[in-house]
């Protein structure tokens, strides 16, 4: 029943797919994603979305708290490593970004995600220059 109510109160598909024609403020996106988490606390995609939105708003500490919780609950969520490393790098926290990339590369190798591995290795090489 709660899911049906949720689907009526939010454009569920548009939130999750990032429909470009759907005009929703960042605050509304975060609220919608938090509503998804309230119904499904282990929803990695929703937690990742919150972290990315917070990072885009420049709320680095809040974003990192979400990324850290995401990766504790779902250590194979490869995108979480890459986006959190980017967030750390933009904040000037290069050593932490390097550590996160190394963990992400290990995850990508473990899960067979060659594309993510290549992306993270490229960023790591750039940071190590």
Q: Where are the language model's segments positioned?
A:
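Structural marker of alpha-solenoid helical repeat scaffolds
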Residues: 39, 72-73, 107-111
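Canonical positions in the second alpha-helix
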Residues: 35-36, 69-70, 104
